[in-house]
Amino acid sequence: MAQLPDPQKLLRNFSRCSNWEEKYLYIIELGAGLAPLSDAQRQDGNRVSGCQSQVWIDLASNEQGNVVLHGDSDAAIVKGLIAIVFSLYQGLSVREIVELDVRPFFASLALTQHLTPSRSQGLEAMLRAVRARASALI
């Protein structure tokens, strides 16, 4: 998997895009950098309900107590949204993930105004899924 940008770099890169077409292309590019999921990770238990597209998110913690995230979707833009979500949570502990409110970050991207309602609902479902799965590891 390509290294995901940290939230500040992601915000800078996003703001450098001159229009929403470029921003969508950047989101898709981020998603293309995600490592493919194994068949074991593509199980029903990792499927995120509430998304129009097929979405899988696998969450585990490593020896240092930091969360390791893997995800995939059958839709390129959604896969990019997964990458954005992962960039916010990468390297954090399960407790930090549960306590972190990422909605202000997404508000600063103005994503919800430019996503279809079903994509916005899917993004919320992904955020809820990550937090719920992190909570289960506490």
From Swiss-Prot:
The record's Gene Ontology biological-process terms are: iron-sulfur cluster assembly; sulfur compound metabolic process
* Keywords in alphabetical order: Cytoplasm
GO cellular component terms, A-Z: cytoplasm
Q: Which domain of life is it from?
A: Bacteria
What InterPro entries does this protein's entry cite?
Cysteine_desulfuration_SufE (IPR023939), Fe-S_metab-assoc_dom (IPR003808)
Keyword Metal-binding found: no
| Pathway annotation from the record | Cofactor biosynthesis; iron-sulfur cluster biosynthesis
Q: Where in the cell is it found?
A: Cytoplasm
Residues at the catalytic site:
51 (cysteine persulfide intermediate)
Q: How does it assemble?
A: Homodimer. Interacts with SufS.
This chain's function reads: Participates in cysteine desulfuration mediated by SufS. Cysteine desulfuration mobilizes sulfur from L-cysteine to yield L-alanine and constitutes an essential step in sulfur metabolism for biosynthesis of a variety of sulfur-containing biomolecules. Functions as a sulfur acceptor for SufS, by mediating the direct transfer of the sulfur atom from the S-sulfanylcysteine of SufS, an intermediate product of cysteine desulfuration process.
| NCBIfam families, alphabetized | PRK09296.1
Matching PANTHER family, A to Z? CYSTEINE DESULFURATION PROTEIN SUFE, SULFUR ACCEPTOR PROTEIN CSDE
- Family as reported in the entry's similarity comment: Belongs to the SufE family.
For this entry, the protein name equals Cysteine desulfuration protein SufE
- Which species is the source of this protein? Dickeya dadantii (strain 3937)
Gene (UniProt)? sufE
